[in-house]
Amino acid sequence: MFAKTKIAVLAAVGLAHFTGAAQAETVLNVATAGSQNMVDYVKTYLAPKFEAMHPDVKVNVVGTGPGDAGSHKIMEKLSAQQQSGAETWDLDVAVVHQKIGGDMVKQGLLAKYRSDISTGKMVTRSTAENALGTDVNGYVMPMFHSQTAIAYNSDFISTPPASYDELVKWTQEHPKAFGYNGIKNGMSGVSFVAGWIYAYGTDAERLSSLPYDKGVEANWADAFANLKSFNKNVTFTPGNAGTLDMLNRGEIFMGPVWVDMFYSWKEQGKIPPSLKLALIAPGMPGQPMYYVAPKKTSHPELAREFIELATSPAIQAEGIVKRFNWYPGIDAEQVKSELDEATWNKLFAEITPDELAKFGKSFPIAPYFDDIKEGYERHVAN
């Protein structure tokens, strides 16, 4: 059906060198933002799988760089081609961060494809429809979800707090045994603070969707005052890794962490088996990476097939859950039958899929997020 096809996954070193592909071959360019482990995942795991299904396809893989900056390079490339009036664009599939995915939809850079792939119906979390206030329904498929949760030492805590209310009471009874990094040097602490505002200021649904109303922050005065009081009973950590280090050394017995980082450290023996996880009510934020298809891809069918494979239960189970300890982009129940019991229990026994769906929240949209961080600096840190 297809002529000899080459899929090139683009690099941070520059997207421009893909503009002059040889006319004799069909090139499907797939750009991936993210750190080196993301690039390696596409190169050493996804690419061979796709090549096995498409014998005439060759996959060459590099990335566009970590963080939103890597995603922004992809958006800049597509925006330039949009402005040039080109009939087709060089990129056919991209992996981008949540915020940039929303920005790309607003700029009209993406194709609506989710209803055209079989895995599109397997997505259940709201992040497939709302990207920090932008309606992205149909334009994105989550590659994975990262999530924050409360780690605790089960040797000393048999029943962890189930809510922010219970956590406040626990810290009053066990001063300095809970630790987090405030809003400095790591997003685990920022996530905890966002969850605090969801609990005591304005709920997550309102703060993670448009429209923005500057007046909403007037409702947070008590939340910030109570957080300042709460902080008198906690230990401040140096950052994401610092919280895990202090848990490992027994300097604290509870604190917010990234779930994937937690399990990776556990596998490496850097934290003891006695450390476990809980996701407290009314919830804490996490975020996805998205697979997207540019609006003027030359090869829409192959692009959809690539994303469909990447979001299939088998690939999500082996690649996303087992290799990286991420939560799957599709509904976890769709992945369960593809996982051995030990892997499922590791990732879902402590935080069940139901709890993840109920208490896994989005981060606030950018202006509310800024208001929360500025409010913390003004009313809590001082």
Could you tell me what each predicted segment is?
Residues 1-23:
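Gram-negative bacterial Sec-dependent N-terminal signal peptides
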Residues 87-95, 236-237, 253-258:
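Paired acidic/hydrophobic, glycine-rich loop segments that form the ligand-binding mouth/hinge
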Residues 146, 224-228, 259, 271-292:
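Periplasmic-binding protein-like
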Residues 33, 39-43, 68-71, 91, ...:
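Extracytoplasmic ligand-binding site segments that recognize negatively charged/polar headgroups
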Residues 101-103, 256-273:
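A ligand-binding cleft/hinge motif common to bilobed small-molecule-binding domains
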Residues 284-285, 289-356:
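Mature extracytoplasmic/periplasmic domains
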Residues 349-382:
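Conserved C-terminal helix/tail region of periplasmic/extracytoplasmic solute-binding proteins
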Residues 25-98:
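Early extracytoplasmic/lumenal segment of secretory-pathway proteins
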